[in-house]
Each structure stands twice: as structure tokens, then as C-alpha cells.
Design a protein with these regions (language model features):
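A glycine-rich (often HGG/GG-containing) alpha/beta subdomain
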Residues: 1-150
């Protein structure tokens, strides 16, 4: 990851892929709020919501067609996991809805996060220590290898 990519706005599914009741898409970076606003019906709410607060709205496409009912939570810098503005969009877990939301976010200016990029940003912004980052990496590796329960 180059230094220039540290300033990009990124998005990623933060819940396991596949069928589920709820999926959470995370968006972080300097344009996270502006990009997320392009994908919801209540654009004013995202700009006025206090950090840590949530609101109900709809994900809409470029033509303002309804895609899904969602809960949006806004975390304002520096009071987020990454230390940057961060938005969580809690949507239904349909793979079609997740794919549509991801496409909307990308077409609005976000790029897909690299593996571990949210945690790298948290480390680079002083939100977690190197020891915490290394522990997180080891835990994920164990989960992937099946040696640790979720």
C-alpha cells in the first residue's frame, strides 16, 4: 500500500460474505461521508448526524430508485476505528444488495479496501499499537486456518 492510497476513501464488507440477515459495509477516508451520501435517500441526515449516532434511510441508485432499507452509523474523525471519518451501512444480507451497494460506492468515488487496510489505517493514525495490529493479524490467520473459534 503506497502513501497515496492512505488518503483514498475505501469501502469493504465487514461481515462474512454469503447469505445472512444483516451485512455491514464500511466506508472510511476523507470523503467517506460525501460518498456515502450519494448512495442514500436522506443525504442531509448523514451530514448533520453526530458521531456515533445512527439513522434509518434507504440505499438508492443513481436514479434514486429504492434498493434497500438500511441503518447508517456515522463515526467522525478522529473518533473512529481508523481515526478517519467512517460510515457503516447496515443492510440486509442479500448478496445482490451487497453487490449493488458496493458498486454504488465505487461509482461514487470509493475503492475496494485491500485486505487489512482498515487496521493498517488505524495503526498509521495511532488508533492501535503495533502489538495490537500483530495480535489481530495472528488471530485472523488462526481463524482462517481453523485453529481458533470465532
Amino acid at each position: 500500500m503506497s502513501l497515496t492510497t492512505l488518503h483514498d476513501t475505501i469501502c469493504a464488507l465487514s461481515t462474512p460474505p454469503g447469505k445472512s440477515a444483516i451485512a455491514v459495509m464500511r466506508i472510511t477516508g476523507s470523503d467517506a461521508i460525501k460518498i456515502s451520501a450519494k448512495c442514500i435517500s436522506d443525504t442531509d441526515k448523514i451530514f448533520t448526524t453526530r458521531g456515533g449516532d445512527s439513522f434509518y434511510t434507504n440505499v438508492v441508485d443513481e436514479n434514486k430508485n429504492h434498493i434497500d432499507d438500511v441503518i447508517v452509523t456515522v463515526f467522525r474523525a478522529p473518533y473512529s476505528y481508523t481515526g478517519e471519518d467512517l460510515v457503516e451501512i447496515h443492510t440486509h444480507g442479500s448478496t445482490l444488495i451487497i453487490d449493488l451497494l458496493q458498486h454504488l460506492l465505487q461509482s461514487s468515488g470509493a475503492r475496494l479496501a485491500e485486505a487489512g487496510e482498515f487496521s493498517r489505517r488505524a495503526y498509521m493514525n495511532g488508533k492501535i499499537s503495533l502489538q495490537e495490529l500483530e495480535t489481530l493479524v495472528l488471530r485472523i490467520q488462526r481463524q482462517v486456518m481453523g485453529t481458533e473459534a470465532f
